[in-house]
């Protein structure tokens, strides 16, 4: 194994690689706030979501009809000065899922190109484009729903470039025994960003109007881009500020997995590799439920618990405190179990995958039965994202174990499977809750639990953690 190089390990939390993890944390924070901004703003943009009884109304109803039924709510959070749109739940589902269409379009090519041209430029450019499009979202909404869908799709393409490039960087910066820790610090930015945007988004909408949600977090993204291009380098060998000790530690730790000169990607071997399909099915299942929670949580709390936009945002943010905490703690625990040789690598991956798929499924199944209990509902909603993020130390980073040389490319494919699940679940959720709010939400959560169980069984059956034969060095590759 690769434990020996760690004997001359450089200091961890004062090291450049942990600084890189923090900057990537901020980048993930920025991208998720830009993605989730619409989920909280739409409560004010489409005042129908404030009134659960209006889910079945036709989109042809005149706007005056909507104002008559929600005049007090509009005055309450001061959206009378900004536009209110007639978007049905089905239309909202399409808008929510459109960003996933864009991400899918760029995940695989950007993962491949990041390995050629460098992840720094790929990720930075994606973050910049996403930030600029966020700033223009309020303007495009006035020109119609089609343009909003187009903008969100292009924004998804930009974020797909940014998401995928991260694993190219970690393949060169993360020592094997620190992978869970470093990637969990970086990945927790998404959970923390969800917490912040959902917590303050409603307050911003109430105080300044919903367009300022996009203006503020789009501007933060532009600042993050400046930091990214200034500090980040593709690998430790070329960073001007890294210490010799840390550079030697990283290089020696990765020596057994270093890439030989780049060749064509062994697509046929990948397609026939069941451990890879186990990872893909894990992503599909995980993203199905996570997309529903991230996208529809404010709407669920608003329509089922009957709270206003400010309280809906604050309540929606609470689950992501648990998510960020579980991501970091899960990474620490996984690396502890590995460094002390308490469990084998595959056992750790399957343990955290099991916890991350089974526990949120149980909570989701229980939700429809406790809808009358405000406190119990909130507790379960907090537990779903928290326990789900334990997967970050399971199959989420499993590509770094089975094929580190192709980690970025395979991460693109993995996220592609996850985003296909997100598109289906977002659209299906919009359709189900438009038919009947009560039974619709019950069917949404039951279906999500079933998908999670399928992914868990598949991963437990076929998941592995050894480097696959087609991903090894030249002497072991096919003729």
From Swiss-Prot:
Residues listed as glycosylation sites in the UniProt record: 28, 47, 56, 68, 71
GO function terms (MF aspect): symporter activity; transmembrane transporter activity; urate transmembrane transporter activity
Subcellular location: Apical cell membrane
Any Gene Ontology CC annotation: apical plasma membrane
Keyword vocabulary terms for this entry: Cell membrane, Glycoprotein, Ion transport, Membrane, Sodium, Sodium transport, Symport, Transmembrane, Transmembrane helix, Transport
TM ranges: 99-119, 131-151, 184-204, 212-232, 274-294, 318-338, 351-373, 378-400, 413-433, 443-463
Reactions catalysed: 3 Na(+)(out) + phosphate(out) = 3 Na(+)(in) + phosphate(in); urate(out) + n chloride(in) = urate(in) + n chloride(out)
Major site of localization recorded for this protein: membrane
InterPro entries: MFS, MFS_dom, MFS_Na/Anion_cotransporter, MFS_trans_sf
Pfam family, one: MFS_1
CDD domains: MFS_SLC17
An annotated GO BP: sodium ion transport
Membrane topology qualifier: Multi-pass membrane protein
Function of the molecule: Acts as a membrane potential-dependent organic anion transporter, the transport requires a low concentration of chloride ions. Mediates chloride-dependent transport of urate. Can actively transport inorganic phosphate into cells via Na(+) cotransport.
Family from the record: Belongs to the major facilitator superfamily. Sodium/anion cotransporter family.
Protein name (database record): Sodium-dependent phosphate transport protein 3
Organism taxonomic ancestry: Eukaryota, Metazoa, Chordata, Craniata, Vertebrata
């Amino acid at each position: 194994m690769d434990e020996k190089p760690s004997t001359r390990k450089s200091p961890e939390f004062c090291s450049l690689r942990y600084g890189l993890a923090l900057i990537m944390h901020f980048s993930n924070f920025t991208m998720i706030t830009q993605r989730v901004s619409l989920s909280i703003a739409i409560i004010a943009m489409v005042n129908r979501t404030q009134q659960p009884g209006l889910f079945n109304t036709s989109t042809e109803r005149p706007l005056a009809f909507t104002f008559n039924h929600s005049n007090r709510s509009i005055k309450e959070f001061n959206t009378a000065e900004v536009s209110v749109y007639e978007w049905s739940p089905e239309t909202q589902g399409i808008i929510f899922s459109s960003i996933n269409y864009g991400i899918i379009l760029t995940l695989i090519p950007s993962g491949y190109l990041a390995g050629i041209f460098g992840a720094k430029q790929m990720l930075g450019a994606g973050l910049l484009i996403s930030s600029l499009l966020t700033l223009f979202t309020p303007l495009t909404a006035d020109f119609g729903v089609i343009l909003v869908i187009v903008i969100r799709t292009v924004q998804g393409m930009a974020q797909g470039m940014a998401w995928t490039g991260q694993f190219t960087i970690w393949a060169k910066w993360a020592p094997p025994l620190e992978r869970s820790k470093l990637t969990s610090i970086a990945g927790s930015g998404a959970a923390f960003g969800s917490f912040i945007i959902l917590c303050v988004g409603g307050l911003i909408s109430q105080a300044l109007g919903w367009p300022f949600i996009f203006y503020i977090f789009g501007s933060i993204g532009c600042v993050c881009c400046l930091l990214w291009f200034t500090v980040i380098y593709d690998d430790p060998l070329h960073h001007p500020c890294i210490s010799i000790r840390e550079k030697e530690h990283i290089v020696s730790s990765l020596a057994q997995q270093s890439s030989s000169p780049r060749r064509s990607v062994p697509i046929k071997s990948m397609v026939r590799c069941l451990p890879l399909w186990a990872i893909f099915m894990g992503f599909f299942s995980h993203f199905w439920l996570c997309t529903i929670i991230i996208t529809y949580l404010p709407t669920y709390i608003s329509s089922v618990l009957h709270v206003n936009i400010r309280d809906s945002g604050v309540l929606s943010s609470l689950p992501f405190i648990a998510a960020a905490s579980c991501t970091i703690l899960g990474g620490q625990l996984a690396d502890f179990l590995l460094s002390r040789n308490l469990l084998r690598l595959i056992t750790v991956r399957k343990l955290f995958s099991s916890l991350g798929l089974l526990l949120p499924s149980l909570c989701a199944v229980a939700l429809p039965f406790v809808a009358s209990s405000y406190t119990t509902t909130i507790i379960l909603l907090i537990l779903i994202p928290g326990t789900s993020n334990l997967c970050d130390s399971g199959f989420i980073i499993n590509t770094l174990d089975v094929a580190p040389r192709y980690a970025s490319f395979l991460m693109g494919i993995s996220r592609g499977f996850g985003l296909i699940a997100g598109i289906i679940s977002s659209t299906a959720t919009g359709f189900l809750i438009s038919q009947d709010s009560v039974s619709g939400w019950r069917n949404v959560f039951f279906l999500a639990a079933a998908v999670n169980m399928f992914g868990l069984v598949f991963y437990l059956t076929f998941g592995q953690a050894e480097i696959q034969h087609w991903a090894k060095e030249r002497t072991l590759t096919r003729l």
